[in-house]
Amino acid sequence: MGSRIFSPRRLYSALSELKTETVIPKNPNKRTRDGSFRKFKRVAPAIGDSMHPFYSPNIMERAILCASEIKPELLDGQPIVPAVIKQLKTLEPALVNTRWQPQSTQGLNDWLEPFRKMRRKSSPLKLIENHEIDNVIRPSRIDSGRIPELRKFALMFEKEDAGILSASTIGSLIDRLAADQEKAVFSEEVFLYILQHYCKSSQGIASVVDSITEFLHKDIDDLKTAETLLAHVLMALRRNSIPLTPRATSAILKLIDSVSTRFHRPFCVVDFSPAVVQMTTEFYVDSGFLKESKVLFTDMVNKERCPSAQLVEKYLGLIESVCGISTSDNDFLKKFVYISNFRPIFQTTMTPRITEFLVSYCRHFDEILSLLVLVDHSKVKKQIWDLVLPQMIRRVSLLTKDSAKNCCHLTVLYQKASRFYGMPLSTKVNKAFIIQYAVNGNFAMVARLLSIIDSNAFPSFYASVLAAYDQSSAFSMEVPSSGAALKNKHQFMTSMIIPHYTEISFVGRQLALKHADTEELLEQVLKAEIAIKGRGGKSLLPQVSLKAQDCKSNYIITEAEKCLQH
């Protein structure tokens, strides 16, 4: 990325080489040298400087942006866009959470042009097929019947005695074979034979790899040969399900470093074929090396090749295990670093598991919509919708603290799901939407969706709706408290809860009693509890009496105490 001239503006310090610093804005009212005061212009980062791998504003978002006369912005101007900028004083690159919030509409069309080009030019990568490794993997050219000394290797690997199975003993046997002019054996052919026939444990792999490393500096003088040997080492791990012990991992890392040194390469793996790069990337991911894995993913993207979906899933899982659960914008920033150039990969391969990971990266509803565009181009979009929709519903429900906005987003998602599946949606999906509408206090939508499904079949589900509504305080949700909202909740209680009250569990009845906030509802609860007690069930009459005292309802207090005395 070339150097850009920055106009005076507010500048944030953040990550330098992936290390976050405290975000401190410059004082906009600080006195300048000439005695005047100035404010720094708000500058939106260029599209090329942003690192978001799946968000791209659609036509409607771009139109609204250009039509905004005041405060044009994308993603509601939230500071959630990972971008690389140059610091004003040092010109050092810094990774920060920025806003797509230009100062004015002037020049917006040019600013948006990279988005249009990205959409026009976006094309899937060529997937790395499993059979491509066959161009590197080959059988050893050794005729075992002509070389009886190979039996010594068989005995050595069968015993796996640490004193016998070592790089030095393997190397000495290979030296003797290579020195025999009648046999005319090359060391790499012996290594290939051993890897293909005898290496079935981590100790065996470590010893052979250490021996290969020694021979790099005295006998192996071709990079393609080194690539073939590394590919066979990794194939032996996969084929024999050999666990990666610290010793085996260390030996393979040392081999890769030695190949780079031997052939004067900064990182030899990037010079290998895409199939070997993919195998090596899988080794790094399985070993927990996140930065090295990112380098190799970048190499595959630069070569316009796409790794397997299973490897992408493994890598995203490694990011989660290393970075942990994101609780702040800086936590998200670290994660975005490791998938910054993954857009071509996501355009090529999108699975339910990949989508699950990416949903957790979304902090704005427009990111969800962009993700759904990628899902629509997937060959397995039906499986993605089936498996990920419940998680997506929950994520959308909690994107903001504004319950009205969340409900609008839920409705848009409901409409998209309806267009995909057709109406009516399944009971499972409807129940997922109902729960999240309840979390946001929208009992009008709760009642509407309950009317679609068989309302008599799920009396126990109604208590779950009340429990979900109680969660709004845990999420610091700003639930509506208007007269209409309270009326909708009261209607839900009278039409859904009270008629099925006796069918609800004891815990569910406790929730119903908690939300019986009028004398009319409390009286209905009292009658139901008296009936339950009459049948010998466990009643809530003492709690009803206490609730009635709070409501100052003398009639209910009297009836509850009369029933308790009997």
Swiss-Prot record:
Residues 1-13 form a transit peptide. InterPro entries: Aep1. It holds the Pfam family AEP1. It is found in: Mitochondrion. GO terms for cellular component: mitochondrion. GO terms for molecular function: translation regulator activity. Keywords: Mitochondrion, Transit peptide, Translation regulation. Its main location: mitochondrion. Belongs to the AEP1 family. Required for translation of the mitochondrial OLI1 transcript encoding subunit 9 of mitochondrial ATP synthase. This is ATPase expression protein 1, mitochondrial. The gene is AEP1.
